Amino acid sequence: MNITNIKKEIISFMNKMNYEVIDISYVPGIVQTCVDEFTGDEYEELTDDTMNVKLTKDLVLDDFQEQRLNEFEAYIYFSYHNIVINYTT
């Protein structure tokens, strides 16, 4: 899925929750392949200065973290897609 389609999907998702999207930004990172020391399974890990997120196939759009900036504004970080959404409530 490309970024444009992901953005459309996220805007639709946010609109259903009655939020107005201010901005959607893609957060670049470095993807590296790692091996789980217990199972031996390979997985991709996305790293940069601020994030260390395991990317797995079973994460979906509702796997997100929300952070309030103030009374009216917040952002959501969708870990699987590595996208940050700034929005008003």
PLM segments and residue spans:
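Short, non-transmembrane alpha-helical segments in secretory-pathway proteins
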Residues: 5-23
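Short intrinsically disordered terminal tails
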Residues: 1-4, 88-89
